[in-house]
Design a protein with these regions (language model features):
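A single, central transmembrane helix in multi-pass transporters
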Residues: 126-134, 173-216
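C-terminal ends and interior cores of transmembrane alpha-helices
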Residues: 44-61
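Juxtamembrane intracellular "pre-TM" segments in multi-pass secondary transporters
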Residues: 152-186
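Helix-loop junctions on the cytosolic side of multi-pass membrane transporters
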Residues: 60, 87-92, 129-163
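Primarily residues marking transmembrane-helix entry/exit sites
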Residues: 5, 64, 68, 167, ...
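Loop-to-transmembrane helix entry
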Residues: 4-14, 209-216
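Substrate-agnostic recognition of the 12-TM MFS/MFS-like secondary transporter fold
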Residues: 12-30, 34-49, 66-125, 135, ...
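Helix-to-coil boundary motifs at intracellular loop junctions of multi-pass secondary transporters
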Residues: 1-2, 32, 88-92, 205-210
């Protein structure tokens, strides 16, 4: 609606930056929290933020700061949900099936990342954006209801407070000791920062420069 590459870039930055910053520390807390509750409340928080986005769009608010704030809040919820989900897999799966299930999990996740934009782009043609957001809310609520039916074993609680410096140092040493991991991590980070602004321009190139339509 605003036809502003800057606005879209800022929205994507608002969705990425909290994960980049908080992701360094989220795992420290997730390892000490109840995984099931962490995922449950993260999903509820994401659903609440998405519902607020639905209301903001439906009411016709034009102040983009609302969108940036709610997008950043959704990103914060995802920052804690993702490591809690990954940390729950070893608690649910027998050790001899762990490699196979982990591979299936990442395959499904990769498939979702590919198919979701296709489905989303198709829905944009037929539905207003606010109703597409409602689908996301329904999905988050369904995930919460599913979690209520799943029993995730709890780890023994510890009273030791997180030592960020120690754990980050151990993480850094592990990255350096494992051959190929550190260069891969650096390359992935650099590629993400370089390509993200470029990807945001593709819709505008299609609509404004090539005079395409939403479906294209």
């Amino acid at each position: 609606e605003f036809k502003s590459p800057t606005a879209l870039s800022l929205a994507i930055l608002a969705g990425f930056l909290p994960q980049f910053v908080l992701g360094l520390f989220a795992g420290v807390y997730v390892d000490r929290w109840n995984r099931k509750k962490t995922m449950f409340y993260s999903d509820l928080f994401i659903a609440f933020c998405t519902l607020c986005l639905f209301i903001v769009i439906t009411k016709g608010y034009k102040d983009l700061s609302f969108f940036y704030l709610l997008t950043a809040c959704r990103s914060i919820g995802s920052t804690f949900h993702a490591p809690a989900l990954q940390a729950s897999i070893p608690l649910l799966i027998p050790k001899h099936h762990l490699v196979r299930v982990s591979g299936l999990y990442h395959s499904i996740q990769s498939f979702s990342e590919v198919i979701a934009p296709v489905v989303g782009a198709s829905l944009v043609v037929w539905l207003p954006i606010q109703y597409i957001l409602l689908i996301d809310v329904i999905g988050a609520v369904a995930a919460c209801l599913t979690l209520l039916c799943v029993q995730i074993p709890s780890l023994q609680k510890t009273k030791v407070l997180p030592d960020f410096k120690k754990e980050l140092t151990e993480c850094w040493h592990t990255l350096r000791r494992t051959m190929g991991i550190l260069p891969l991590f650096v390359c992935f980070t650099l590629v993400t920062f370089v390509l993200m602004p470029v990807f945001t321009l593709f819709p505008f190139m299609t609509l404004l420069h090539f005079n395409g339509n939403i479906l294209q």
